[in-house]
Amino acid sequence: MADNSATRVRVPSDRNSRRKIKGEVDIISSLPDVILQHILFSFQTKYAIRTSVLSKRWRHEADAINKALSQYTAPKMMNFHLKINKNNSLHHIKKWTEFAMSRNVENMSLDVRFRSNKIPRFYEINSSVKSLSHRLDLHDVIPRHGVSWTSLKKFSLSYCGLPDESAKILSGCPILEWPMQIVAPQIHCLKLRNTQLPCTLVDVSSLTEAEVLDIIIFPVNLSYNADFLHATMLEMLKKLKNVEKLTFSGSYLQNLSVAEKRGVPFPMFKVKALTLEMKHFVISDIERMLQSSPNLKKLTVRAKDNTGKYLYRYFARLESGSMLELKKGV
């Protein structure tokens, strides 16, 4: 049965009633700050500003972000998203982001679509941010002495270069969720070097050249079950199998061998130019790679220990009677 006790609201239609309401304080303006802030900051800034037609309380302050932020007095902020594509807004970045940090923001997104080394390095130490998204060049934000983001779990990078100093960020995020994911459908060359962090290639569909050097896909300090190992290795191999110019290190070949022994099928590669940078080598690992590269035309071997001459002799025998061009790297 329907509840007939619901309160009905009738909008006055006569002129006197409208005049009376016009002179009274609007109901929205009488709401507590915390409630108003929750309502306003649930919208994008441009929509929040439009709500000023409903209330006089913040109407005169809705003409600028600085004034809008001045109305936010709650001690906690869940989300802060900043998108800037004009250089004349650069001087506001520091103020706005410091404001978000002062409110213990948990999820923050910075979308800065121009290059400048003037972006302030303001957040070296932070314990509240759990999710951080950057669309800017990391050269602009990496502090000289690294960071300490003790609560950060999710870190997203878009349209930005990764300088060598980026390791300072990763080392300052003790609970960052792994594996690292690379989504870069437009890049043609990818180089993964000197990392012990698990990495997943999500979209590298335009890739024609890749270097995978001295990486440990499955770090010994992390506990992976066999199924996870199989899936991760297989997915990375699938993303690299169409690359025409490929460079592998001996450690990566060893990872391939381990994965195959655990049941991961070794894919067929379309590589035409293969470079192997070897500190130590296992003949069976190398043979397996060559067997899976039927289109191979050029092989470059760079040996970094005293066994280089023996390795070169082995490859020289393979060259005899084949179309393979063998080059001894330095």
From Swiss-Prot:
Species this chain originates from: Arabidopsis thaliana
Organism lineage string: Eukaryota, Viridiplantae, Streptophyta, Embryophyta, Tracheophyta
Matching InterPro entries: F-box-like_dom_sf, F-box_AtFBL13-like, F-box_dom, F-box_plant, LRR_dom_sf
A Pfam cross-reference name: F-box
Name of the protein described by the UniProt record: Putative F-box protein At1g57690
The F-box domain, residue ranges: 25-72
